A protein has these predicted regions:
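Non-heme Fe(II) oxygenase metal-center motifs and adjacent flexible, charged/small-residue loops
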Residues: 1-195
Length: 195
């Protein structure tokens, strides 16, 4: 389905695809620092059943607004630093990718993201969700609580995950807390939203 990506079957009907960022797009130390410097000062606030909660990581949308958990993450223009990555993803995965959501994780601050399905509001139907992992290795976990199913995948520097639309609906995903991982990680998630 996605050339240059390895298929990982999850349940006979759904899969996750994993690959590597091409070497020409790898972020060196200076590039990583430039990307890290883009994180907002404040944490995004979302609505949870118990009330408003700050996300345990920094987050910013680029290109298109991202609506989820009762809030809007208002988009900024795509930084030139990310233009080559977006162009590659359009060519390698899906031509209508037009939005990026960055999450900045600081291990010293215990940053993580809990189990969730990505919001599909305003997304192009059946378009996959692409996540690029930069920096320190973390675990990318997929779960189906009703089936007590769990799959862990290492999210190393330069790892690219492609999650089909149907997989996102059927499986939750997360980057769990880690007492061992004290470094910094950036995830770049690309989606295709209707114009």
């Amino acid at each position: 389905m996605f050339r240059d990506f390895e298929r990982h079957d999850l349940d006979g009907r759904h899969a996750l695809f994993a690959g590597r960022l091409p070497g020409r797009l790898a972020f060196d130390a200076a590039g990583f620092e430039a990307l890290w410097a883009l994180h907002p000062e404040d944490f995004h606030v979302i609505h949870m059943p118990g009330g408003p909660v700050e996300t345990p990581r920094w987050q910013q949308a680029f290109g298109r607004d991202y609506r989820y958990s009762g809030r809007v993450n208002s988009a900024l223009p795509v930084p030139p630093l990310l233009d080559p990555l977006l162009a590659w993803a359009r060519e390698a995965v899906h031509g209508r990718l037009n939005a990026l959501l960055l999450n900045w994780y600081d291990g010293d601050l215990g940053h993580y993201i809990g189990p969730h399905h990505d919001s599909t509001r305003d997304m192009v139907p059946d378009a996959p969700i692409v996540t690029v992992s930069l920096g320190e290795e973390r675990i990318f976990r997929l779960t189906q609580p009703k089936r007590k199913a769990r799959r862990d995948f290492p999210a190393r520097d330069g790892t690219v995950f492609v999650m089909p639309y149907a997989t996102n609906l059927a499986w939750k995903h997360q980057v769990p807390r880690s007492a061992r991982r004290r470094g910094r990680r950036i995830s770049v998630t690309l989606r295709a939203f209707e114009e």
